[in-house]
Amino acid sequence: VHWSAEEKQLITGLWGKVNVAQCGGEALARLLIVYPWTQRFFSSFGNLSSPSAILGNPMVRAHGKKVLTSFGDAVKNMDNIKNTFAQLSELHCDKLHVDPENFRLLGDILIIVLAAHFAKDFTPECQAAWEKLVRVVAHALARKYH
């Protein structure tokens, strides 16, 4: 994947403003609410019975932070995303059996969360760069499935 200097700047510039705990928790909660079938991967998280239960669930927030922290590794290693996510791809494929389509859905949700938090900075050019990044990350996570 080739990244232009402008794409890298748009991604790293916005990433520097992201509150990983807040945006990560919100992104995972949105995923579980908007796409309820994804909840089956999180049965150990306790109460996921309603949107308010999901939004208030500390395990959802903690795992969302973990997910977005790991996404930060993509931002730091934009020229080597495939290798950066090799182990996570293996885990999600072989052990957790996550449908790789869910990675794309989470990427879409992350775009919405970033746009909501950074409306002024989230220009069409910025969105295009982030859309490319979430596609590349989703593809890297799905790599073990191919």
UniProtKB/Swiss-Prot annotation:
PANTHER family: HEMOGLOBIN FAMILY MEMBER (PTHR11442), HEMOGLOBIN SUBUNIT EPSILON (PTHR11442:SF7). GO terms for cellular component: blood microparticle; haptoglobin-hemoglobin complex; hemoglobin complex. Heme b binds at H63, H92. Keywords: Heme, Iron, Metal-binding, Oxygen transport, Transport. Involved in oxygen transport from the lung to the various peripheral tissues. Residues 2-146 form the Globin domain. It holds the Pfam family Globin. Belongs to the globin family. It comes from Eudyptes chrysocome (Western rockhopper penguin). Transmembrane segments: none annotated. The keyword Ribonucleoprotein does not apply. One of its GO terms (molecular function) is oxygen binding. Red blood cells. InterPro entries: Globin, Globin-like_sf, Globin/Proto, Hemoglobin_b, Hemoglobin_oxygen_transport. This is Hemoglobin subunit beta. The keyword Flavoprotein does not apply. One of its GO terms (biological process) is hydrogen peroxide catabolic process. Heterotetramer of two alpha chains and two beta chains.
